[in-house]
Design a protein with these regions (language model features):
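Short acidic, glycine/serine/threonine-rich helix-capping segments at coil-helix boundaries
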Residues: 1-47, 57-61
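Alpha-helical segment that forms one wall of the substrate-binding/catalytic cleft
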Residues: 4-14, 40-41, 54, 108-189
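Exposed boundary/loop context
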Residues: 18-21, 70, 146
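Short secondary-structure junctions and interdomain/linker hinges
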Residues: 19, 77-78, 143
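Acidic helix/loop microenvironments that form the catalytic cleft of cell-wall polysaccharide enzymes
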Residues: 26-38, 71-77, 156-160
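Export/targeting segments at the very N-terminus of extracytoplasmic proteins
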Residues: 37-138
Length: 189
């Protein structure tokens, strides 16, 4: 059994939600706002040369040049949006496959569909990438399945692979990406 909305609210409170959420299992506006707020990190640590070398060696390379090139090309140089949120892409077709439900949003149209698409940047011009708003809306329906339906970080690794990457739950993978660039590279390697 995956994380419930009530467990998500408890997790958000433990990770700095402000104001504290009522842990009632009802995912409303405050839960959506808190979800986005706790993942903002404008001071995320950049990867060091030693960490890059560690990643390169784990991939069988003794030079950081190739892994640096991959990082530059794959992410336009950064794993974060200007807002301080880690880069993600909402994949509505994954959410549909996992939930078997078509969901509509007044702002974003379909957030769950058998087909991919509906990729938007900032349709409501509020400075928050739409993938984050779609995710915030979807975690209020099914947190685990929503978090498995995003590609995360500098290298856009799908959340559905959280177990293979050594995370206990999908939210741990996103939290790791929030904290440092090194974690983005570890997901790739």
């Amino acid at each position: 059994m995956g994380m419930t909305v009530k467990e998500l609210q408890k997790w958000l409170n433990a990770h700095g939600a402000s104001p504290k959420l009522k842990e009632d299992g009802i995912g409303g506006t405050l839960t959506k706002s808190a979800f986005i707020q706790v993942f903002v990190n404008k001071d995320a640590k950049a990867i060091t040369k030693d960490q890059l070398l560690e990643i390169a060696k784990s991939l069988g390379d003794n030079s950081i040049k190739r892994i640096e090139a991959v990082g530059k090309v794959e992410s336009s140089g950064s794993g974060w949006f200007d807002s301080g949120l880690p880069k993600i892409l909402w994949e509505r077709h994954y959410f549909y496959r996992l939930t078997k439900r078509i969901l509509e949003s007044a702002t974003f149209g379909l957030i769950s569909s058998p087909s991919s698409g509906n990729y938007t940047s900032d349709i409501n011009k509020n400075g928050i990438n739409d993938s984050w708003e779609k995710l915030a809306e979807s975690v209020c329906v099914d947190p685990d399945k929503a978090l498995q339906s995003i590609s995360i970080g500098k290298f856009q690794v799908m959340g559905i692979y959280y177990k293979e990457l050594g995370y206990n739950q999908p939210i741990d993978m996103l939290w790791a990406a929030r904290n440092s660039e090194y974690e983005h590279y570890k997901m790739l390697a």
